[in-house]
């Protein structure tokens, strides 16, 4: 090779090949969260990422399909990569569940947050509707008590399940995340027990 400096000109290399040791992925969760099949590539990518990879989820969403969010939460918890949730506008409803699963939370100034319970409809015989409502209530209590634990007070989670909406600005969300981190004691063996909170530039 004619290159004599410490820098290597890849255009002059012969019989040399490049292998990436890490990747940075940018995923844009913008607008409504749609059907789960729209996010199959995201889930697969997260599950096959390595500990050297970084995944940015750029959030500007008013929520949507909660079961799609639940599957993404599973993939976020399973991935070996570092997941950064960057809120860049709206983070509401089901989008807040995804946000709170990240390893690092970035919040842009003037972003807007809203936390509330799920919406659904029931049909069928009266007994079937009653059974469905009771099952949904039990499911929602378990989900929100886990997802919002440490971020919302137990009394606030109960109010959400009962129908109250909680609106927050970036400063309020940052304070709650920092308080949750101080209280958190990740179980032994937990890969990433604590979140980092960053104000996006």
Task: List each model region and its residues.
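Conserved strand-to-helix beginnings and helix N-cap segments that scaffold or border functional pockets
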Residues: 39-40, 66-70, 96
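Short, basic/hydrophobic alpha-helical segments
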Residues: 44-52
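STAS-typified acidic loop motif
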Residues: 2-41, 61
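Terminal peptide-recognition signature
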Residues: 29, 57, 99, 113, ...
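Charged, glycine-interspersed solvent-exposed loop segments at helix/strand-loop junctions
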Residues: 27, 55, 122-200
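Catalytic phosphate/metal-binding cores of nucleic-acid and nucleotide-processing enzymes, i.e., regions
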Residues: 6-20, 48, 58, 70, ...
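Glycine-rich beta-to-alpha active-site loop
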Residues: 77-122
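Short, glycine-/small-residue-enriched flexible loop/hinge segments at domain edges that mediate gating
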Residues: 52-68, 82-89
């Amino acid at each position: 090779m004619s290159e004599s400096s410490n820098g290597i000109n890849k255009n002059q290399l012969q019989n040399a090949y490049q292998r990436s040791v890490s990747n940075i992925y940018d995923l844009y969760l913008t607008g409504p969260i749609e059907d789960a099949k729209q996010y199959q590539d995201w889930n697969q990518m997260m599950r096959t990422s390595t500990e050297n990879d970084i995944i940015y989820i750029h959030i500007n969403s008013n929520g949507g399909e909660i079961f799609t969010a639940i599957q993404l939460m599973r993939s976020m918890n399973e991935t070996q990569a570092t997941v950064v949730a960057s809120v860049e506008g709206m983070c509401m409803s089901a989008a807040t569940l995804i946000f709170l699963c990240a390893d690092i939370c970035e919040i842009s100034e003037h972003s807007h947050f809203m936390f509330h319970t799920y919406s659904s409809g029931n049909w069928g015989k009266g007994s079937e509707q009653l059974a469905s409502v009771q099952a949904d209530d039990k499911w929602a209590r378990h989900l929100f008590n886990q997802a919002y634990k440490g971020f919302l007070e137990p009394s606030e989670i109960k109010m959400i399940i009962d129908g109250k909406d909680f609106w927050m600005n970036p400063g309020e969300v940052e304070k709650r995340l920092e308080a949750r981190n101080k209280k958190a004691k990740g179980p032994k063996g937990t890969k990433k027990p604590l979140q980092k909170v960053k104000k996006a530039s």
